Amino acid sequence: MHEVRAGLETVALNQAMDKATEEQIRDLHHHLEEMFEAAKDGDEKFFMESDIKFHETIVDMADTTDLKKFWNMCNIRLWTAVCTKRSEKELQALAEFHVPVYEALVNKDSEHAYKTMREHFHNVSQYK
């Protein structure tokens, strides 16, 4: 599932670079800040919701109906919950894995985006 989701979100990230509005970029940053806030508070549930919103915002930025359908078929809520609960990483580290993804989008660096998204999913899939 990691590879499928990584592929979908890499495509979404690259498309989002050309289509994202300033409001969507602010929303994405807000979700990133929420992840750090949840990590600081040790609030795993809020962290997972913010994580899902972060990734969903990227998919929405791509503005592709079929991509969103496939993404929804991946059962993101369950997948995020399993990965978060089983991860050997602290919530703070999981939040930090999202920063390069955000930066790649803001900087419109498609080459870095591909590498960043692959690394992101590799990092979050490391289990106890």
Give the label of every model feature segment.
Residues 21-24, 40-47, 63, 67, ...:
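Residue-level recognition of alpha-helical structural elements
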Residues 1, 5, 9, 25-28, ...:
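A general structural signal for well-ordered alpha-helical segments in protein cores
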Residues 10, 29-36, 41, 53, ...:
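C-terminal all-alpha effector/ligand-binding and dimerization domain
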